[in-house]
Amino acid sequence: SALAINQPNYSVLKELGLNED
């Protein structure tokens, strides 16, 4: 999600595969 991209731990979410475009 766009909100996740704004989070400082976005890279962590990306690692976990939780980031949604």
From Swiss-Prot:
MF annotations from Gene Ontology: L-aminoadipate-semialdehyde dehydrogenase activity
Going by the record, the broad EC class of this enzyme is oxidoreductase
* Catalysis performed (reactions): (S)-2-amino-6-oxohexanoate + NADP(+) + H2O = L-2-aminoadipate + NADPH + 2 H(+); (S)-2-amino-6-oxohexanoate + NAD(+) + H2O = L-2-aminoadipate + NADH + 2 H(+)
- EC number per UniProt: 1.2.1.31
This protein's source sits in the domain of life called Eukaryota
Keywords associated with the record: NAD, Oxidoreductase
* Activity dependence on pH, as recorded: Optimum pH is 9-10.
UniProt subunit comment: Homotetramer.
Q: Give the family, as the similarity comment puts it.
A: Belongs to the aldehyde dehydrogenase family.
Q: What is this protein called?
A: Alpha-aminoadipic semialdehyde dehydrogenase
